[in-house]
Each structure stands twice: as structure tokens, then as C-alpha cells.
Amino acid sequence: MFRIAVDCMGFENSVSEAVKAVIKYAKKHKDLSFVLVGDENQIRPLVENKKYLNYRIVHTTNEIGMSDSVLTAYRKKDSSMYLTIELLKNNEVDTIISAGSSSAYVALTYNLIGKIHHKIKVGFMSYVPTVTKRGFWFLDVGANKEYLGEELYYLGKMANTFITSVFNYQPRLGVLNIGAEKNKGFEYHQVVYNLLENDKTVDFLGFIEPRGLIKGECDLLVSDGYSGNLVLKSLEGALKSVGKILKKNYKINPLGALFSANVIYQITKTFDYKNNAGAVVLGLNKLVLKTHGSADAKQFYSTIRLAHESLLNNLIEKITKECSTFLN
């Protein structure tokens, strides 16, 4: 039985959003055990009558705020995030999920859990929908702002292993850049390009421009965390704006909206990022996942699903084994 700990506090929505997702997922997957970390007075009434739910509660009323510094996060050893990470550190659970502060989460997991290898940097890996049937996986989207070319290469290799292990296909890998030409970008772009180009274990496409992402030009995109976060938030903002435009036109022309309802439904369903809101924190010794700071039950649910799929496919074991082939 896999054990999943969920940090139920420290994000923009209420505790109930995290708990509702756990309840819904547990109903379909009774082979899982959950540890809910947060205010028991808020959690207990939501779960006490759910006979199918295998759970325990780790009580705390303290949380790490989104604006708290990393130093403050370290001092809050009784916070929901810190206690959640300690559960994984002490092998009381198999994976953890949080929607809290990204900077605090990366710093605490890095120090309490540790990295697979000292040469790598950890990265957030998120799924982005496209106009094609299959979207693409994108990292780093915010864990680390700067990378050396070798570090981006290692990140790409780990992400490649993640996709082949969990989803059973060989991804077409690209590197984010302002142009597709080989000489574009900074020095680290040239380094990672040459390393990937000469690696026969990956299907390397070359540099990918942001305008080609929604068209599905690649299955896996590698970037530094600063650029990656900018692009991801720009895409999310653009897709939300499209949704608002569609809703506005419904009101102006309800008859036209009626006839195009199915098409509109398919568009909104395809680009609903909440269906794939989980980010794997690649590079750590144990399985750690992050979801949006504004996560609702739907986003927590999709993150739990990704955690479960990763556990079923022994993700960390496979990535560690893969790292041993190119790191020493």
C-alpha cells in the first residue's frame, strides 16, 4: 500500500480543497493510505464518515506563508509543510504533495530529503496541453533561476526517464530558445545543445521557440527556471483570456454559442490546465510533487493521480539508476 502525505495548508484556498481531492481519489483507489497534515479541527469533519478512506491526521495550525522567506520557513518546524517533508524524510510516507510556497518547498526538500547526485539541480516539471492529442512536459518552471549547460542536460535526461517510465513513450526533446538556429542563445544553450545532440539515448529536436509550443512541436521542453516560469505563466494567462473571450461571446450571441457548444467544450476541456496541475520535483532522492498556490480540489486531484502513477512505475528508482549511467 502506497502512502501519500498532503500538506493541506499554506496556499491560497481553504483546507477543504485539498481534503476533497483526497476523498475523491481514495474512493476509486482504496489501496492507498493518506496522511493529512494541517488543522485537525478543519480536516476531521470532512473525513470522519468516509469509511473507505485510509487516513491519519498530523495536526498543526501553523503554516508557511507565500511571502515568508526561506529562513523563516526553516524556523517554522511545526508548520504543515515542514511536518509533511519530515514524514517523507523519516520514511513514514512514499511521496508528498504541497501547494505552498515554491521557494520554501524547494529549499526544505533540498536540505531535508537531499538530491540524487551533487552535480544536478532540482527542477519543477509540469504538463502543458497543446492543440495535438498529447501535450508536452516542461521543466524547469521555477525551481532554479540559473543553470549551467551540463545541469540542463542532466535535467533533460532525468525528465526523459520520467516520461519513458511513467507514460511509456520516447519523448521528442527540445530546448527553449529565442530561435531555432544552432548558434542562438547564451553559452549554456550551446553547451546543452551539443550534449543532447551527441546523446543517442534521447530524441533531440534542437532549439524550440515559444511560438511553436501550443502547436505541439515537442513532447519535452527543457529551460532554465526563470525563462520557464515566464513562458508557463504567459501560456496560462493566454489560455484563460481565450476562455473569457468565449464566455463573453456566449452572452452576445447565445444562439451561435448553442450551435458551437460541442466545439467550445472540446477547446476548454483540452486547455484546462487543472486536469494536469501537478509538477514533479525532479532531482531529489524521494518522490516530491508540487501543485499551484491557488490550487482547488480538481488540481489537487490531478496531482495525487500523477503521484500515484509515479509510484506505480518506481520513478525515483529508475531515475537514480539512469543518473548512475552519466554521472560519477
Curated annotation (Swiss-Prot):
It is found in: Cytoplasm. GO terms for biological process: fatty acid biosynthetic process; phospholipid biosynthetic process. The keyword Cytoplasm applies. Keywords: Cytoplasm, Lipid biosynthesis, Lipid metabolism, Phospholipid biosynthesis, Phospholipid metabolism, Transferase. InterPro entries: FA_synthesis, Phospholipid_synth_PlsX-like. GO terms for cellular component: cytoplasm. One of its GO terms (molecular function) is phosphate:acyl-[acyl carrier protein] acyltransferase activity. Its EC number is 2.3.1.274. It is an enzyme of class 2 (transferase). Its main location: cytoplasm. It holds the Pfam family FA_synthesis. It catalyses: a fatty acyl-[ACP] + phosphate = an acyl phosphate + holo-[ACP]. Pathway: Lipid metabolism; phospholipid metabolism. SUPFAM superfamilies: Isocitrate/Isopropylmalate dehydrogenase-like. It comes from the Bacteria. NCBIfam families: plsX (TIGR00182). Homodimer. Probably interacts with PlsY. Catalyzes the reversible formation of acyl-phosphate (acyl-PO(4)) from acyl-[acyl-carrier-protein] (acyl-ACP). This enzyme utilizes acyl-ACP as fatty acyl donor, but not acyl-CoA. PANTHER family: FATTY ACID/PHOSPHOLIPID SYNTHESIS PROTEIN PLSX, PHOSPHATE ACYLTRANSFERASE. Belongs to the PlsX family. This is Phosphate acyltransferase. It comes from Mycoplasmoides gallisepticum (strain R(low / passage 15 / clone 2)) (Mycoplasma gallisepticum).
